[in-house]
């Protein structure tokens, strides 16, 4: 499954962190990397140098303008977070991750200073956390290295059998956009905050229901 996992970095601030993350992923055999709106244009010299022996991976990184665009073809999306969120998205540990079967899985990492917002996490089917002590201060590349190592150490990750064909993220987003437009036309609510919360709740429900393409 290694080639079926996309490591997606959302709004990364430092090119060196991107390069070191790519180096970490490459060491464990992962080579599909995406960036959403990086602060500095990519590729660049600092990032390439930081990637060390994995320059080829660094140069074929895909750049996206938004998370929905980046995960459009993914059947399962996993968001990383250092803290619990007030969202109805289930937590998943590595043992449970090993059992996931899908054509395409994306793991999203937040930016260095703020992580992922609730809206950004709402695009995920699951939330993955790394247990730490009180000071939760893992560098982006450290987090990527831990996740890549944990996934590479299990032979189950290498299985190719597909047992369920979940809806792609782009299909879910199309449905949400259609429904929100329908509610807007019927003036279901004119309060922006309520509309925003409704969209998050709806996305969380659809993402965690494991709806397949049947």
Write out the residue ranges for each language-model feature.
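Post-transcriptional modification and biogenesis factors for structured RNAs
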Residues: 1-214
């Amino acid at each position: 499954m290694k080639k079926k996992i996309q490591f997606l970095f959302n709004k990364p601030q430092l090119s060196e962190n991107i390069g070191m993350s790519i180096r970490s992923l490459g060491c464990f055999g992962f080579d599909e990397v995406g960036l959403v709106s990086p602060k500095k244009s990519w590729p660049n010299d600092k990032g390439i140098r930081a990637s060390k022996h994995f320059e080829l991976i660094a140069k074929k990184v895909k750049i996206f303008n938004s998370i929905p665009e980046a995960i459009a073809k993914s059947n399962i999306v996993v968001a990383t977070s250092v803290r619990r969120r007030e969202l109805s998205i289930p937590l998943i540990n590595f043992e449970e991750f090993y059992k996931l079967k899908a054509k395409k899985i994306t793991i999203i990492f937040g930016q260095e200073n703020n992580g992922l917002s609730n809206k950004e996490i709402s695009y995920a089917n699951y939330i993955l956390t790394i247990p730490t002590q009180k000071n939760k201060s893992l560098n982006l590349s450290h987090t990527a290295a831990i996740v890549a190592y944990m996934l590479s150490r299990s032979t189950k990750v290498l299985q190719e059998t597909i047992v369920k064909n979940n809806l792609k993220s782009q299909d879910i987003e199309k449905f949400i956009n259609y429904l929100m437009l329908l509610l807007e036309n019927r003036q279901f609510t004119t309060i922006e905050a309520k509309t925003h919360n409704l969209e998050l709740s709806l996305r969380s429900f659809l993402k965690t229901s494991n709806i397949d393409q049947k």
